[in-house]
Design a protein with these regions (language model features):
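Short glycine-rich His-centered loop
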Residues: 1-13
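Serine-dependent carboxylesterase/thioesterase catalytic core
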Residues: 2-4, 22-111
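The serine-hydrolase catalytic nucleophile loop
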Residues: 14-21
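C-terminal catalytic-base region of ester-bond hydrolases, centering on the histidine
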Residues: 10-11, 84-149
Length: 149
């Protein structure tokens, strides 16, 4: 089971502004995974062992307190709403954007000993369509499923 927390300015708009993440959801489903997407304002509904968050969904993922095997963050935002990664999270991959070019949004930094940071430089809205990052995500999830976290 995988939960995706979408981005968006107000939450409800995530299904429109996070089409790239919904594309990732479809790729995961084709690979046989059960995947549910939530808007960032409904982050408390997430309860899967694998959490993927984009933009506001990425920052909200850091607020989750239940056990998480793998958390993958796509340019979490806003940066000032990021929480240090808790001990409830086994592994984190953060696609940290060095130049999000989105009027102060994007560029969140994941902090914790279990964080692997992948530096990227893309416009914030475009990062969700980056197939090379989606391929990394798919690989990380497959490795976790095989027990190689």
């Amino acid at each position: 089971m995988i939960d995706i927390l979408l981005g968006g300015l107000w939450g409800w708009d995530g299904y429109v502004t996070s089409r790239g993440m919904l594309g990732l959801q479809a790729q995961l489903q084709v690979s046989g995974f059960e995947v549910e997407a939530f808007t960032w304002d409904n982050y408390k509904q997430a309860n899967a062992p694998i959490i993927i968050g984009y933009s506001g969904g990425g920052s909200r993922a850091t607020w989750l307190k239940f056990p998480i095997e793998l958390m993958i963050l796509y340019d979490p935002s806003p940066s000032w709403q990021m929480e240090p990664i808790g001990t409830n999270v086994k592994k984190v991959i953060c696609y940290q954007n060095t130049s999000p070019m989105m009027l102060g949004l994007g560029g969140g930094v994941a902090i914790g000993p279990q964080v692997e940071t992948i530096m990227v430089s893309e416009q914030h809205l475009l990062i969700q369509y980056d197939q090379s990052l989606h391929n990394r995500t798919l690989h990380a999830i497959a490795a976790m499923e095989r027990g190689h976290v």
